[in-house]
Regions:
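A cross-kingdom feature that marks ATP-driven nucleic-acid transaction machinery
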Residues: 1-124
Length: 124
C-alpha cells in the first residue's frame, strides 16, 4: 500500500546523500495545464542538462509525464528507477521525438551520476 510513496522517498534520500558539502533538496517537475497535469518525480542536473528521473514502485508503469518533459527538453535523455534490470531503450513520444531511457534498479541509485556519464557519452 505504501510502496508508491516509500520507494521515491528512499531513492531521493540516496541521491541527497551524495551531496556531502551542502544541503540539497530534491527537485521535481510539474506541468500544470487546465485539463491535465504532469509530474516527474525528480530532476537532476548533469553537465548542462536537466535530466528527468521517474521512480516506479514496480517493473511496469506509464511514462506519460516523462514524455511531456522530454517534449520540452533540448536533449534526448531520461531515467527510470524501478525494480527491474538495467537497460537502455530507445523510445518515441506521441509527436515522434526520439529519446533514450536508461532503466536502473533501485540499488544503483547512488551510482546515478556514473551511469549518466556513460549514458550521455554513448547514446546520441
Amino acid at each position: 500500500a505504501y510502496k508508491g510513496a516509500i520507494i521515491p522517498h528512499l531513492v531521493a534520500q540516496e541521491l541527497m546523500s551524495l551531496n556531502t558539502r551542502k544541503s540539497v533538496k530534491p527537485i521535481f517537475w510539474v506541468r500544470e495545464k487546465n485539463q491535465s497535469s504532469a509530474e516527474v518525480d525528480l530532476v537532476v542536473q548533469f553537465n548542462k542538462m536537466v535530466i528527468p528521473v521517474e521512480i516506479k514502485s514496480g517493473k511496469e508503469g506509464k511514462l506519460k509525464s516523462l514524455h511531456q518533459f522530454i517534449e520540452a527538453a533540448p536533449h534526448p535523455y531520461a531515467v527510470r528507477m524501478y525494480s527491474g534490470k538495467f537497460s537502455i531503450e530507445e523510445h518515441k513520444t506521441k509527436t515522434d521525438k526520439k529519446y533514450f531511457l536508461m532503466n536502473m534498479p533501485y540499488y544503483l541509485s547512488t551510482k546515478l551520476y556514473d551511469y549518466l556519464d556513460y549514458f550521455v557519452s554513448n547514446f546520441k
